[in-house]
Design a protein with these regions (language model features):
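Short amphipathic alpha-helical face segments that pack within enzyme cores
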Residues: 14, 18, 45, 141, ...
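Predominantly flavin-linked oxidoreductase catalytic cores and closely associated redox partners
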Residues: 131-264, 317
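Dinucleotide-binding Rossmann-like beta1-alpha1 core, especially the glycine-rich loop
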Residues: 41-119
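A short, flexible beta-alpha/helix-coil linker loop
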Residues: 29-32, 222, 247-248, 299-302
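Long, low-complexity C-terminal extensions of enzymes
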Residues: 65, 322-465
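Glycine-rich FAD pyrophosphate-binding loop
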Residues: 20-38
Length: 465
């Protein structure tokens, strides 16, 4: 199959690398169009899909391990809480009872609490104890990393000026260099410009995910690097801190209905603005339209919280690669409908999960007073007043957000406080002591693990920066 990928950002070169392993692939992108990424996070899916040496990836992407997220000031009941990457990888009843008795449980939680990486001290090689982790990456270096690794036939440094179609299928694209490229599959990774697909094909999420702007900034002082993204609720949205090997990316995500950029910079104080980013939360309706596949920001965007963009791209890409081994299947309308439904449900499931984070009951500004949560989130929160959510309460879709990811957020925002089982625990001291001890045992001891800064120093000392 001959594949033409349009786009040169993180998604564009990540997709080009993946598809070039199994198909004849060319890439069309230009440095004149800047990369949107400002420092990003991934989920465990990233390492799972690419199966590369994590140390090699940390070198090439300026990356460090990400074990989860620390949330500060997201509710009126709790100041801060930790949420492990991809939920809590343990049996369901552990999740339930340790949440009720103490906090979410797992090695990730303990490592984050002690601000350690998942790499051992005093080992001749950098050995990872627990490989279910994401990464904090530099978007620019990640794009270049995959570009260098790709088995691409040719890279066209050009812009698309015309898309030629016949009976709804793309037959060729014309470039500003005069080149005309034909292909069996055309992949749109052109970001918000969506040069290959219909810009009117849009499902809006802004009713529940109202943030639509971000200011990226620097500060004079840097905190120690930690194994998590720091997400802090603010007056008009929230700020992030993402530690990579050579810098700590920072930004303020907000809604321009409630604040101007000047308001944001005033609240932040003594910072240096790097760039501004505009975005819309939502998705397209047709992710696959005959022989045109949309991935990355071209297919949709929720908001920066929970590192959804790269995760969704990989879920869509992997499903497509397994489902469409040959180009003759592009004419199968049932397969196309099933793929589009899968991608739509995947995005909607992630929208619900991100919406959950805004349910902590904050009312200190108009932004927090006005923000709404989705119908599904309302249902789950209502359920916690009667019983604990179970796995069957969540959508059955590969890659969708499961109970394991919801529980730490529900606990951290205080939604378990009104659960009858929690109230029983609060009066049953023996059960409380038992499950707190089990949580401590399950988390283990972290004294033989490197801090993130120690890990970073070791990577630098290897001389491959």
């Amino acid at each position: 199959m001959r594949v033409v990928v349009v786009g040169g950002g993180t998604a564009g070169w990540m997709v080009t690398y993946y598809l070039s392993q199994i198909h004849l692939c060319v890439n069309v992108s230009t440095k004149e169009i800047p990369i949107i990424g400002v420092g990003e996070g991934t989920t465990g899916k990233f390492l799972d899909v690419f199966k590369m040496d994590p140390v090699d990836m940390m070198h090439g992407m300026d990356a460090l391990p990400k074990l989860g997220i620390k949330f500060d000031n997201w509710s009126k009941t709790k100041k801060s809480f930790l949420s492990p990457i991809d939920g809590t990888p343990t049996a369901s009843y552990y999740i339930d009872y340790t949440c009720l008795a103490h906090r979410p449980v797992g090695k990730h939680i303990t490592l984050m609490d002690d601000e350690k990486s998942n790499y051992f001290i005093d080992h001749p090689n950098l050995i990872c104890d627990y490989n279910q982790n994401g990464m904090h990456i530099d978007a620019y270096k990640t794009s270049e990393f995959f570009k260098q690794k790709s088995s691409v036939l040719k890279h066209y440094d050009a812009k698309v000026v015309k898309v030629n179609r016949e009976y709804g299928r793309i037959t060729s694209i014309e470039l500003d260099t005069g080149d005309v490229l034909k292909g069996d599959l055309f992949v749109d990774c052109s970001g918000f410009s969506r040069v290959l697909n219909d810009p009117d094909d849009w499902v809006d999420y802004s009713e529940y995910l109202p943030v639509n702007r971000a200011v990226v900034y620097r500060t004079e002082t840097e905190n120690p690097r930690r194994p998590y993204t720091l997400a802090t609720a603010r007056k008009y949205g929230w700020t992030w801190e993402i530690p990579t090997r050579t810098k700590i990316g920072k930004g303020y995500v907000y809604c321009d209905k409630y604040a101007s950029e000047d308001d944001i910079l005033e609240e932040l104080g003594d910072v240096e603005k790097v760039k501004s980013v505009e975005f819309k939360s939502g998705r397209i309706a047709k992710f696959l339209d005959k022989n045109c596949l949309s991935l990355g920001l071209s297919s949709g965007f929720l908001e920066p919280l929970q590192a959804t963009s790269i995760h969704l791209t990989l879920m869509q890409l992997e499903r497509f690669a397994y489902g469409y081994p040959t180009e003759d299947l592009f004419s199968d309308e049932d397969m196309e409908r099933d793929y589009n439904q899968y991608c739509a449900t995947l995005h909607d499931s992630m929208r619900d999960f991100v919406s959950l984070h805004y349910s902590g009951g904050k009312t200190d500004t108009d932004f927090w007073k006005d923000v709404k949560v989705t119908t599904f989130v309302q249902k789950i929160i209502s359920l916690t007043k009667k019983r604990l959510p179970r796995s069957f309460d969540f959508p059955k879709i590969g890659g969708g957000v499961a109970q394991e990811s919801y529980n730490p957020i529900l606990w951290g925002l205080g939604h378990f406080d009104g659960c009858p089982v929690k109230q029983t625990f609060d009066t049953d001291n023996a059960s409380m002591v038992y499950w707190r001890q089990r949580a401590k045992e399950f988390g283990g001891n972290t004294s033989n693990y490197l801090t993130i800064d120690q890990l970073n120093d070791i990577i630098a000392s290897l001389g491959q920066t």
